[in-house]
Amino acid sequence: MKKFVAFALVLAMAFALCACTPNEDKDDFKVGVILVGDENEGYTYAHMEGIEAARVACGLEKDQIIYKYNIEENEACYQAAVDLVEQGCKIVFANSFGHESFLIQAAKEYPDVLFCHATGQTAAKQTDLKNIFNYFTAIYEARYVSGVVAGMKLKELMDNGTVTDPHVGYVGAYPYAEVVSGYTAFFLGIQSIVPDAYMEVQYTNKWFDLTLEAEAANALMARGCVIIGQHADSTGAPSAIQAAHDDGTYPNVYSVGYNIDMLNVAPDVALTSPQNNWGAYYTYAIKTAMEGKEMQQDWCYGYIDEAVQISQLGTACAEGTQEAVAAVIDKIKNGELHVFDCSTFTVNGEHLTSYDKSYGFEGTELIWDGYFHESEVISAPLFDIRIDGITELG
């Protein structure tokens, strides 16, 4: 039921972008989708929801969408892309960071096909190809809001004497900018409520691994963490936290998930999850391709365009959380609040006033007007700064 509700929200948002204009070639239009996982993995499931919302909004039949599941970040991606083109796909999407170079390879060989890559950093800006595109959401905004949810709970636990140490944990997949940006936004959201909070990050070095994510959560609980967020794609961490709650080992530890509502697996401890509304992009891209119009080469939108959100609040959330969340989202939308406001964090005890990013963008200043302009130079996150108050464990 929760998955249906989530899909309904994405679908409604997709229709709001406007249904695709019919044309004589619509019945022949095919869409290829290369996925790093399948419906059992939260990140990929969110992309599947977005594609399905776009399919309905654009009036396509199910057999006009061709999926390639569990495609690793290697030559298999190139082979999948070629096969999709040979099956008649006019636009091909790939949803994992490591797919990019293989998608570029295919784009060079098939200039009349559009290739769109999620989370990429180079395709749209560092090639002369006109048929390669990057896309992401401003998920850091939703991660900040989820941090506010966590901070409200942490404050409640401290105010009532349940805990005395504002120790937070985070299960991260890899030490990439995407993950660093996300956990920093989450942490800053927490600190906006509990300024003394500090956080430890445990890496799994896998995007999706139930066992490793559960082990990371258990290790963080053993270290005294009372709120645990994640940028990893399974239900492993919330499930482990729920199990520790049920057996009394750690009855007062709470979870903030990612991608999907975690209340099904962690009903007593799940607070919320930051979520991408991928349907916003997929509807835009498919509609634009079908109409033969020029497509934005590097796309990123957030709360103001309904491309991100947090899931429903769990029953364990602190009183007043809904009101706090609404206020923060309003501030993000009207530009009053910037997630990476440099006055809210330090690096080695100093506030940053300048930061030049590499990744082929040497000399590009990312800090002006007092904050780091995430996902503005390119759609993919570039914030890889290790700020004070956060420790990476490995």
Model regions and ranges:
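A residue-level marker of the well-folded mature domains of exported/periplasmic proteins
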Residues: N23-G394
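Positively charged n-region of N-terminal signal peptides that target proteins for export
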Residues: M1-L9
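C-terminal motif of bacterial Sec signal peptides marking the signal peptidase cleavage site
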Residues: A16-A19
